[in-house]
Amino acid sequence: MDIAKWVEHARTCYSTQLDTKIKVIGVIGKDYPDHGKGDNINCYLRENVFPVAATEDETCTIRGHFSEDDQILFLVMNGVDDVANIRKCLKSNPKSNYFDAMAESECQQIRMLHFLFISCHFIIIFEQTSRIDLELMRFLKKVNSARIQLRKKINQRLVASDLRDVSFNNRILSSAESEGRMVVPRLLIAFQRNNIRPDVNPGKKLQRELYEKLEKNLDNQFSDILKLYDLIDCGASSLCQLNETIPVVHLLNPKIVKRDIIGEMFEILMADAENTKISGNAGTLPSNNSFVKFLEDNFRSEKNEISLENVIELMNCLQCVLDGDLEEKHEKTAIQTFIKRIQNDHMEEARRLYTNAQRPGERRGADRFKDSEKPVKIRSKEEHLMRFNEATHYIDSVVGVNSREALSQLQAQCNEMWQSDMRACESVSMMGRSCVRKIHPTFGDQTAPEHRWTAHDASNTMISTCVCGRKQLIRPEPFSVKEANSDFYDHPDFKCCRRLWRYQFQLYQEDSEEKDDIMWADRESNSLRAAKKMAQREDELAEEDTDLDIPESLLDPDSTSPSDEDDVRVRTMSSSESSSQESDAYLRPTSRRDESMASKTERELTIDHVKRMQKLELAGKSEDFLITVPNSMTTGKLPIFPSWHLTSLGDSSIYSHGAGLKNQPNFKIGGDYLSPVVVLLDVNFDVWNRDLNKIRSEDFSRKCGKDNKDDSARVKLFVGFEYECSRGHRFFVDYNGEPLIYSKGSNVIRESAHRSSLGNVLQADLPIRRPCTCRKLPLQSAQLQKVHVVTPKAPVHITIDPKVLIPTHEGVYGTGQEPLELHHSKYYILHLPTVYSGPSGAWMPGEFNPEKQGVWMGGALKVAYKPVMSFKW
């Protein structure tokens, strides 16, 4: 009978069993002329309880039957898709058409399903086909939405009826999961038909194996579909659940369940005519043993916890769900739903404008594009505001009512999207480009753990040469002065530079640091005594190897000749790597600090520097040192890292003016020659000859010199002002700042002497940046990066004191120290800063400027006579 009538008469009919613990089972499915969903329950009960098909008076109702033997209350729902309901809708009132009648039936079905899913232990779905009905899954999703919407009101009814604390089953639910319902039902599904061939012998074991395999596959498919529609595994938002250990899918055996409907009708008719009882299977139905076992296995998995009396009270309390008393009026709900849908559409379009996403209809065509062609979601603050203004303009144009509320909601959503997943870092590199990463914790960020610290990335690289010029590497754009001027030149791949003497510039040191170790290297490097010790070291090594020049294997013209093309060719092998027999004559002294730094990675060194800076800041010493390039405006302070580098490649015999530079990559053919410079000295010739003979005798004893019969008071140096662009192209310039390239086949010695006579490159003011010799677009600017000096074998005192002027910057950039002393008969390279940063900020020139920028002030290199006897060697 109908559930309302069953509730009304249940207390009277089952008065003796009101305390019996029972289960509540819901049954849903479709009725067909030859088979109804209630037939399978009849087979389980072995009696005709539910009709084969519902009548038109029983459409969209729930039929109830309590089995005293099984202690189960069965609730069978007659739904929208039953044949009787479709027939009824076709015969509907002329004032309402078929579609209106079906819409009303669907609303009632949502209420009935809602009723079942909050009051049944198990719900059995009978599928008359061999496939899962996705339309039913979509319908259940609507039911779940209705349940979530009304759960607070239903919970109030349950509390008012004192049913909230009643134990419904042995499953424990959280307060959120139990709100608005007594139980989360377990779902079972049975298929009336299957795809197994009918000619398979049912008596064979193969048939059962086929059934089990198909059931297992359907079980997995059923679980995936429920998850796809968010019906299970969603916490408090789940509509139902599945048993994890017992199968929930069963294939009915059609040969056993199939009924002869015409035969039954004939027997009933004959029984009425003869006024006799129905014989045979009319009163007792055959049982599908496997289906009965399937149900019993699932039913036994839960204990009966709720009494029949409480179930009757629950059904009576939940009549409000079936009647629709908790729902708002249909007209009001429809209008609100329409308005809300329009608002959601407008907000979705506004979000699409902000994110620059494609409309749903355009996604199919967009799928053929690669991921690299999709719009970049990371945005700077400027881009964020621009996109937000577009979305705001759209909302203003389409929303008339409550536009302020919509704009406030849009602003909150856009800000949340930008802050959470779309905000760009926006840190600017020393070359003027922004970091392309999402906002991230940088080195020293106290709000994030150390392992999350990430370096910036401008998504742009350039090619730079090491201090000695023998190797080039690709480097990312630096984001700090230290990274640009110091860290890169300590790269572990620059092994060629580690083996050379390098001047130790005075750096800021705390009292607790290894000041003695650092200052020892400082004193030893900046004195002629250090040069003498280096010469003595060469003498010791010369006894084993008299040849102090670079090995011939490194002078192979095929490996050192630069290309005439503009394409960048980066050397991956330096001279120190190409031969294991290289002389150790120019090994630089190592300190304890050098050894400790060599064992650490680049990241560890960066973290150590950051922690040191934080320590100095906490100690209030952040103003005691420089984190920029020394400047005349910042006298009295020492830098915390070097921006200038001075190194000695070794003896002056390394350079041969007739052959040019060796092992220096990326020079153009004819562009790897230094400029000879003759310096006249005002000196007493007798003293000059005496000191010159002294130098000669020492050189002869060390087998490093040649006879020099020229006793005139003049000396010759070889100097080169080297420029380098971001592509790694290198070239020298003359006194006018123009590229110095000798044509093929020319006499370099004669032509260079002629060019030197035209102007003194030592006294010339040269540009810091000028156009590169590149012909490949886009054109590049090159920067003065190195000064090469080959000192003569003569009793002279040579110093270099660089001074640089930068446009719009105050003061003069320099080393911040006394002029640097250079020993005679050596090859030196002074490496200039890559980035000039001072009190006026950092200099960030563009990629290309046809004009010359900045000034290297002439007169930085000075040569003076100093008698040898005045030195204490």
UniProtKB/Swiss-Prot annotation:
Domain of life: Eukaryota
Function: Involved in nonsense-mediated decay (NMD) of mRNAs containing premature stop codons. Probable component of kinase complex containing smg-1 and recruited to stalled ribosomes.
Basic and acidic residues: bias regions: 591-604
Listed transmembrane segments: none
Region (Disordered): 531-604
Family that this chain belongs to: Belongs to the SMG8 family.
Signal peptide: none
GTP-binding listed as a keyword: no
Gene Ontology terms: cellular component: cytoplasm; striated muscle dense body
Compositional bias ranges of the Acidic residues kind: 540-550
Alphabetic keyword roster: Nonsense-mediated mRNA decay
Lineage, opening ranks: Eukaryota, Metazoa, Ecdysozoa, Nematoda, Chromadorea
Disruption phenotype: Defects in nonsense-mediated mRNA decay (NMD).
InterPro entries for the chain: SMG8-like
Pfam families: Smg8_Smg9
GO biological process: nuclear-transcribed mRNA catabolic process, nonsense-mediated decay
Gene that specifies this protein: smg-8
Ranges of Low complexity composition bias in the record: 551-562, 574-583
Keyword Protein biosynthesis included in the entry's annotation: no
Protein name: Nonsense-mediated mRNA decay factor SMG8
